[in-house]
Curated annotation (Swiss-Prot):
Domain of life: Bacteria
Reactions this protein catalyses: tRNA(Asn) + L-asparagine + ATP = L-asparaginyl-tRNA(Asn) + AMP + diphosphate + H(+)
SUPFAM superfamilies (UniProt xref): Class II aaRS and biotin synthetases, Nucleic acid-binding proteins
Coiled-coil portions: none
Gene3D superfamilies in UniProt: Bira Bifunctional Protein, Domain 2 (3.30.930.10), Nucleic acid-binding proteins (2.40.50.140)
EC numbers for this chain: 6.1.1.22
An example molecular function term from Gene Ontology annotations: ATP binding
Assembly and binders: Homodimer.
Protein name as catalogued: Asparagine--tRNA ligase
Principal place of residence: cytoplasm
Swiss-Prot/TrEMBL keywords: Aminoacyl-tRNA synthetase, ATP-binding, Cytoplasm, Ligase, Nucleotide-binding, Protein biosynthesis
GO cellular component terms, semicolon-separated: cytoplasm
Similarity-based family: Belongs to the class-II aminoacyl-tRNA synthetase family.
């Protein structure tokens, strides 16, 4: 049977309701017991007075942390309680009496908690992160749908690398080599030639032997590709999407942000349009800060942090040197040394959150780039077909969901941004 959700208790003040959930915590003053119950939508305190319900009072003494229960009671307004309401308990049913719970309310080490990630997710903090992640995903879907983009799923098993990297998870696909996708981008370009504007959500995999706070082996990308979009159109789309997401989270998940201790003013300070720095300007900025950095090098995490510290909003770095970007990036017609690619760097030191750019639409140039990058042309014949049959200017990007969640929630590590993180040397549970 369904009960009333805790988040809806405000609609039932002075009414008797039934809620279902798990015992998060309890305390007693001898004659009164306080049962803190969670149901995934919030927490509520149930109050049990011994003299008013002695049998229920005794039954409640048996309850252990995370026991599944059904509570019946009268909803009362109580500003001092979590959520502003509490329940005067009139009935209690134990659905399942939990065994001794391994995660207590004291501090635990990260490895201990990661080994019990399937249980750690039940805490209010982890609940809040998961809800914010879900809100970000829903906001992105709403944004794309409002802008006439079509959801087109891309494959996870692919015959070739998207960018020719060595960080691939290789598979034996019925005797042939195949790989777990690092990006749906090449397929997204094909989809854009079919539907005009497309987006997709999907897991991506990179076998990077990295243990930084920004890296996972398996992570989710929100990707988009649009025919007839040039470089500037692409950056405008990105900033509007990120702004839309931030505003949606502020509107609908403020309480979760507050639970996490997030400085909400940092998110409220974000304005459109986002600042733009050319790669060359970013290099000069780093040098002015005393960094030994040469034109042609790629930015590392410390460099991105230094750059981001100069801006309240995310900042675009655009027109990177050709040598450090992917083979499909379109050269800048005004400067052949650089490509029409841009990264969006998150504020507060969270690094690159979006990578994107305008794609090469000329067949001969794309064939030349494949050769320069020593990529097998035969594996990309289908991709070259896109330039043979009705090629048009087109652009796209990919947003790293976990890094975006980490920034919006201001988390120390991306491992908390995904239900079951896959990191170097960790694939359990």
């Amino acid at each position: 049977m369904q009960g009333t959700l805790i988040r809806h208790l405000g609609k039932h003040v002075d009414e008797e309701v039934s809620i279902q959930g798990w015992l998060y915590n309890k305390r007693s003053s001898g004659k009164i017991q306080f049962l803190i119950v969670r149901d995934g939508t919030g927490l509520v305190q149930g109050v049990l007075v011994k003299k008013e319900a002695p049998e229920i009072f005794e039954l409640a003494k048996e309850l252990t942390q995370e026991s599944a229960i059904r509570l019946r009671g009268i909803v009362r307004e109580e500003p001092r309680s979590m959520g502003g309401y509490e329940l005067t308990v009139t009935g209690l049913e134990i659905i399942n009496l939990a065994q001794e719970y391994p995660i207590s309310h004291k501090e635990h080490g990260v490895d201990f908690l990661m080994d019990r990630r399937h249980l750690w997710m039940r805490t209010p903090r982890q609940n809040a992160i998961l809800r914010i992640r879900a809100e970000i995903e829903q906001a992105a879907r709403d944004f794309f749908n409002q802008n006439d983009f079509t959801l087109v799923d891309s494959p996870i098993i692919t015959p070739a690398a998207c960018e020719g990297t060595t960080t691939l998870f290789e598979l034996d696909y019925h005797g042939e080599k195949a790989y777990l996708s690092q990006s749906g981008q090449l397929y997204n370009e094909a989809s854009a030639m079919a539907v005009g504007r497309m987006y997709c959500f999907g897991p991506t995999f990179r076998a990077e032997k990295s243990k930084t706070r920004r890296h996972l082996m398996e992570f989710w990308m929100i990707e988009a590709e649009a025919a007839f979009f040039d470089f500037e159109d692409n950056m405008k789309l990105q900033e509007e999407m990120v702004y839309f997401i931030v505003q949606r989270v502020l509107e609908r998940r403020r309480q979760d942000l507050e639970l996490l201790g997030r400085d909400i003013s940092k998110l409220e300070a974000i304005k459109l349009p986002f600042p733009r720095l050319s790669y060359t300007e970013a290099v000069e900025l780093l040098k002015s800060k005393g960094e030994a950095f040469e034109w042609g090098e790629d930015f590392g995490a410390p460099h991105e942090t230094i750059i981001s510290e100069n801006f309240e909003s995310p900042v675009f770095i655009h027109r990177y040197p050709t040598e450090i970007k992917a083979f499909y990036m379109k050269p800048d017609p005004e400067d052949g040394r650089v490509v029409l690619g841009a990264d969006l760097i998150a504020p507060e030191g969270y690094g690159e959150m979006i990578g994107g750019g305008q794609r090469i639409d000329d067949l001969q140039l794309l064939e030349q780039r494949l050769e320069e990058h020593k990529l097998p042309k035969e594996a990309f014949e289908w991709y070259l077909d896109l330039r043979r049959y009705g090629s048009v200017p087109h652009s796209g990007f990919g947003l790293g969901l976990e890094r975006t969640v980490a920034w919006i929630c201001k988390l120390d590590h991306v491992r908390e941004t995904i239900p079951y993180p896959r990191m170097l040397y960790r694939v359990y549970p």
